[in-house]
């Protein structure tokens, strides 16, 4: 599928034409109560969201959560059954993709194998009838922007996966769209290439100031690249927020467990500042929001389960190391703390200092401010 989609009026005005602007105080993109069904399956369930001009937003969630369906609805590729989409003050809800203002990059690159890199980048401009000289100039400028000036005469098969994705990105930008849509563009690449390219995409987005939406199931990718993350589950939005907010202050149990690693235990509020988990009493600032005796899920990040080296306030638990996974810069410990299964993450330096190995005892401390609580059905 062609990755250079945009309004014909912009093409006729020239590739450098300014995108339409929304009124002051209005969001650049407003998604209003979108619902999309495939037969009896509801892929999007009354979804609403606003995105500001120049933002980099990631749609994050597991397979089947609706993130790609939402992206495709914004593009007009899978139109919604209900709801509206307003872009730059214009209702695009019923417009075909060719009349919407966006460029899109797919996971599969979608490059034409029989065309050179230069021709691939300029394809959308040629199809809109722009002069050949203007097309080549624009295509070469974009190849320079993505660092591929010396690859213009090559064919896609002669490029690496990372280079092909850069070509697809350049082609998506050729029409100077107001919105860039990225549908899991890095998932087919090797790990090191993926990390490098996501940094390049973020730097390019900042340089151009283009409003960007990227779909991903990779939590680390979303945390590292997004201005805001939209966490989705079962066709609904669970939480919208900055990476730090979503990671440190998840609003639901699903977000807590999906974004990053999490220890999740069943407990009961024991008072204004503590929860009872098994035989342990764990100090928790969040307990003040619940009545005594309330069943809760008790959540603690592995990096917040720290060795007791003195001076750190919190609950101290005597534990035994049951397993150790060395991951280079960090080590992941599986602990048994008086019958409670806990995962802790330590820096390589801390691991070497403590000289830990399976079977050895370790006292850990959990700061009360780092304990998250979520309501729990008593039988759960």
Feature names for model-found ranges:
Residues 2-13, 278-325, 349-380:
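Glycine/charge-rich catalytic "coupling/switch" loops of P-loop NTPases
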Residues 56, 95-254:
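ABC ATPase nucleotide-binding domains
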Residues 83-91:
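Conserved ABC transporter NBD signature motif
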Residues 75:
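Helix-to-loop junction immediately C-terminal to a conserved catalytic motif
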Residues 81-84, 134, 234, 266:
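Conserved coupling/switch loops of ABC nucleotide-binding domains, chiefly the family-specific signature
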Residues 60-62:
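The feature captures the beta-strand-to-loop junction immediately N-terminal to the Walker
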